[in-house]
Amino acid sequence: DGSAAQYGSDAIAGVINVNLKRNSGFSGALQYGGNVSNASNNFSGGIDGQLLQLDLNYGTSLGKKGGFFNITGTLANRENTSRAGIRNNSIFNAYNAVERIAGNNGVNLSSLFGNITNTPNQSQIINYIKQYAPQVGYFTTAQQTAIANASSLSALQSALNFDVTNNELSARGLSRKDFNMNVGQSKLATGQVYYNAKLPLNEITSLYSFGGLSYRKGDSYAFYRLPNGSGTSTSLYSNGFLPEIESDIYDFSTALGLTSKLAGFDVDLSTNLGTNSFSYTINNTANATLGVNSPSSFNAGKIAFLQNTNNLDFSRNFDVLEGLNLAFGAEYRYENFKINKGEEASYAIYDINGNIAPATGVATNLAVTDFFGNRRGGGSQGFTGFQPLDEINKSRNSFAGYVDTELNIFNNWIVSGALRYENYSDFGNTLNGKLATLVKVTPNFNWRASAQTGFRAPSLQQKYFSSTSTQFFTNSTTGLLEPKQVTFFTNESRAAELVGIPRLKPEKSKSISTGFTFKIPSANLSIAVDGYFTRINDRVILTGAYARPTDAQVNATSGAAQQALKDLQSAFDSKYAERASFFSNGINTETKGIDVVITHKHNFSEGISIKSDLAGSYNHTQRVGKLQLPQTLINSGSNAASYAFTFFPESSKVYLENAIPRFKASLSNNLSLGKLDILLRNSYFGKVTDPGATDVNLDGFSSVYEHPVYGGKLITDISIGYQYNKNLRFTVGANNVGDVYPDTNPTTVPAFTNTSPGLTSSPSTDLSNANQFVYSRAVSQYGLNGRYVFARINFNF
């Protein structure tokens, strides 16, 4: 039920009423659990994802007039999970093998060059390779001959460019499992303290406050950098490395308010402050352009957000008809978003002399390369730090006023309406309204309906977030995934202006909903049904990744169009970007759905009963109307279709419409047997569609419109609780007791995929990324951690 007319931005689909603890006494819970699954630890079995959590709560009275103070603390430590398969692609090439032998003899081959075609040590490198290659015992005679006959580095590059993974793994005493990614939930340690307090000052006035502080330290992983990849400096990591992304997250919030009465009105004056900061540290990594001089840990920067709201609210009941409730008030909101840059080496690309690359890029003869001449990427591998051009400190404010009325026309008929006006400093005004009615048709049957308009202001993060990260795209020649530096440009950047991205404006909604509740008291049965329809215009999307304009594209134009493309090249180069994405008001959507909840309770005898809850929902969102394409010189002419496809690609459409289950249902049965209770819950998650393209019909080919579909699954949870006495309760249970996993990624890779609206073919992408993503990394019905077993002790005194 939309509530933007009452509460403002983000309440398009309603709000949640959170009741904070205010009880007295001491209570807590200690819980331990983990994923006991056949697929734990990369399908080795056992247990992973262990969680140990302690919750404590204490409440006491405050003053002598009914005040209270309640505080809650939580400490938790969660281990990571991983569900990666055994890597099945190339890991080592022949150069890696020769490099290993040379290293065993005290020679670091890769330290002898920065740029393989621009090094004074070419003869030395050639001689070392010819000296140590014969010691690689598994090279064939033909391979040894090719190496021995090579008289130049280019000839050696050709002679050493073949896969030796299986033999080299054996020589190094390793297995393919040693090169697995970590695919699953991250490691997490957290501590939280929150409070809720109220202090009556007199009979009509009370002071209240609530808030808290939390800290979370996360440890997740990026893609494994293999030793045969250009992003790996084998001088530092001879077997490649798995970058770790460490996060430090602080959240702080506090509210202070005063309630009283004035001229018959209940008055609430309050201020709320909330902050969040997210710092990144990248460990077990390297800046490949620094070679052996690279650190292994980087401060990659920080993002932070602050919001302060100040509210004055009035409400009063009037003796009109069967009762009129009038509420009105005002709000002032201030928001601030910051990005702090990381250390230089976390984002910079260096040349072979250790100088930072200019905005125009590194000259070919000065670029740092691997042995085969591939340019090495800059910045900390796994997560590139925020750059100086990413740094931002932006704020905005808004003023709002609202009125909300509810009139009981008769004892069985209520009508209500609300109107809210807001003025934002960055995009202007918005006015939203709501009408609703509730009819008590019979004592046990209620019908309601509502219609409302709403909005969602573009967040400061959507407007000003800027970052460059490593993403993987299919090589149009080899079909293999290769890293590209992708930049998110701000909405107000020069790059966005050149592409034609307009300034962000609010999303606007119109919605209607209706529903009924029906009770049969004699049968302890209640039924609730709700249906809804929401239309959202100007929905904010993240565009696909645009490629940097090539010199050929620039030279094919003239005049203003050519200058625009040159300026766009400069914008890319200033951020070391090869691809770029933008936030834009790009589409309109419609969402329709229905929710059904049926609750029943049956009492067998004193202390023995069963309560059953059946809930089901169907929800479908789809894009409607035309794309809101920017009109610029860049998207004109024959490239228009391709430009539109990049603006909102097929994968984004699937994410929007089919990436979450349309149908969900659950049946919970809670059997109470005196001090013992048993909970059995069955949940069904409907099918989902992966945005990746693959050969679904097994004809050997695929198109960008051909996607795998993962079928619906039934998940069963069970728990048994025992109330030992009034102070102690014990619970054991298992979520997903059947250890049910989603359907696996397709294992066959088609010959090619038609990857454009014109169905131009190119080599296909392996959706499993060499068997690392056994399950989809793009969609999730219910998670991929399998069975979770736990035990919990609850206590109160």
Predicted feature residues:
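A beta-strand signature from Gram-negative outer-membrane beta-barrel systems
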Residues: 1-29
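Surface-exposed extracellular loop regions of Gram-negative outer-membrane beta-barrel proteins
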Residues: 22-29, 33, 156-170, 178-179, 275-279, 284, 336-338, 391-392, ...
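Repeated loop/turn-to-beta-strand initiation elements of outer-membrane beta-barrel proteins
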Residues: 24-26, 66-69, 204-207, 264-267, ...
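Outer-membrane beta-barrel signature, preferentially recognizing the C-terminal barrel domain
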Residues: 190, 386-397, 457-528, 535, ...
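Outer-membrane beta-barrel transmembrane domain signature of Gram-negative proteins
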Residues: 235-237, 241-256, 261, 273-275, ...
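Gram-negative outer-membrane beta-barrel transporters
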Residues: 328, 531-694
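C-terminal beta-signal and adjacent terminal beta-strands/loops
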Residues: 536-537, 620-623, 683-696, 721-797
